[in-house]
């Protein structure tokens, strides 16, 4: 009995709470914990607040750190951070970006890099809640982050501070969801297993424009800019749904599942969102206005839209796809532009200025209008054609087919019938000789003809009667 009591007592001692007082003038509980300022709380083994700057500012308080090795690190006495969870980390930086987003809440002591806020408590800080979370100034990250492996175009490792930092260095970024990662200024990810990736590592400010304002809402989505060649990749991309992807694209909009937009990108005049020597906009309202003007002035970047499922665009600009399994592709030297596609299983390849509504159309020429479905897939390789109706076809450039199964096959240059000579006219004027392909309302080769009714008398010699 005595041995049992002693053993029980030893177990209780071995499992006792780690309530060892830590260091600092704040509230610090836990072995190796540290709360360096009054009004700061650090609870947990190795939990600590760290202030690298020596501002001498009196109002340095409000940081809350709870969890094993949870940390807030402020470069210059910024305060108000929250880090909750094992290895949660908040890094409050000082630099041109931080000054740009200060919105005149405080003055800085110099221009450009190295300028320090006169009132550090007026500079925004971060909130990280969940194991292995990491955010920079102004950021919010909530959720468990223990994934190690490939996601989008990067490989993440949440084991170390340095690796976590690579995936989440965007200022004012927001991540809500387990094992999602956001590296973009004012970028937002909501949902699990998403990524907004960048090669921005805090050094090359030119890379910081990647993913500015990018947004994901859903799961298994990726906005990939880490491997992109263009520093404006990801800017203003919006993805809503499941398993969608953009890569090396800006101004892209995706709503649905399984859609892909790649290489839909233009260079952007990003002066309005690029930190300079003299800080940034005077207010959030002004920044919002600046971004609206940037979007308008730059024609929304690559500006490709995909709504539905399984749509794919590559090397496109100013393109819209609505429906399922539509594909629009160009090349680096021949970008497909100004295409509008709605329906199912339509394809546009190396062509621009097309309107397709229906199913199973394959377009390889410019300036085509195809409205209506097809009973089987067909390739349109001649330009400037218009077909309206189910199974309507046009096989000559500029041909027009109107109605079910109509077929435009008569090319320009056909001479009109001269009743006076009872033969084709020899007059080569446009009155007698067509300068564009014919309009067809049937297919005489397949015994399909139509009357055209309710036609008024013509005014000119070239009017139908």
Q: Which residue stretches match the model-derived regions?
A:
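Glycine- and small/polar-enriched repetitive beta-structure motifs of secreted/surface proteins
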Residues: 3-465
């Amino acid at each position: 009995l005595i041995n049992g009591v002693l053993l029980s007592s030893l177990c209780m001692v071995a499992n006792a709470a780690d309530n060892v007082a830590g260091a600092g003038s704040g509230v610090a509980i836990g072995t190796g914990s540290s709360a360096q300022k009054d009004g700061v709380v650090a609870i947990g083994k190795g939990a600590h607040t760290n202030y690298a700057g020596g501002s001498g500012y009196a109002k340095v308080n409000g940081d809350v750190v709870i969890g094993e090795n949870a940390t807030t690190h402020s470069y210059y006495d910024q305060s108000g951070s929250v880090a909750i969870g094992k290895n949660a980390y908040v890094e409050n930086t000082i630099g041109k970006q931080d000054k740009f987003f200060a919105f005149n809440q405080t003055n800085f002591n110099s221009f450009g890099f190295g300028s320090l806020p006169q009132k550090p408590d007026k500079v925004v800080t971060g909130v990280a809640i969940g194991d292995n979370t990491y955010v920079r100034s102004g950021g919010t990250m909530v959720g468990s982050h223990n994934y190690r492996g490939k996601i989008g175009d990067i490989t993440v490792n949440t084991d170390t501070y340095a690796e976590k930092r690579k995936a989440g260095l965007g200022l004012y970024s927001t991540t809500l969801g387990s094992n999602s990662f956001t590296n973009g200024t004012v970028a937002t990810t909501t949902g699990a297993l998403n990524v907004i990736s960048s090669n921005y590592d805090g050094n090359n400010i030119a890379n910081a424009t990647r993913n500015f304002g990018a947004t994901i809402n859903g799961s298994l989505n990726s906005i990939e800019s880490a491997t992109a060649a263009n520093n404006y990749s990801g800017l203003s991309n919006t993805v809503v749904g499941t398993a969608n992807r953009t890569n090396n694209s800006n101004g892209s909009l995706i709503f649905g599942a399984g859609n892909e937009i790649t290489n839909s990108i233009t260079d952007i005049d990003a002066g309005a969102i690029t930190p300079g020597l003299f800080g940034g906009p005077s207010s959030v309202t002004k920044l919002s206005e600046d971004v609206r003007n940037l979007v308008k002035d730059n024609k929304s970047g690559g500006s490709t839209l995909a709504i539905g499922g399984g749509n794919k665009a590559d090397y496109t600009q100013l393109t819209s796809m609505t429906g399922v399994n539509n594909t629009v592709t160009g090349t680096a030297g021949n970008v497909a532009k100004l295409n509008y596609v709605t329906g199912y299983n339509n394809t546009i390849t190396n062509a621009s200025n097309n309107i397709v509504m229906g199913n199973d159309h394959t377009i390889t020429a410019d300036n085509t209008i195809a409205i209506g479905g097809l009973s089987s897939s067909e390739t349109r390789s001649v330009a400037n054609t218009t077909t309206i109706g189910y199974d309507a076809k046009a096989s000559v450039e500029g041909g027009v087919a109107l109605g079910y199964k109509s077929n435009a096959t008569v090319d320009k240059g056909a001479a009109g019938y001269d009743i006076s000579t009872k033969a084709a006219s020899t007059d080569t004027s446009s009155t007698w000789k067509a300068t564009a392909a014919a309009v067809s309302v049937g297919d005489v080769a397949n015994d399909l003809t139509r009357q055209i009714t309710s036609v008024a008398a013509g005014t000119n010699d070239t009017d139908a009667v």
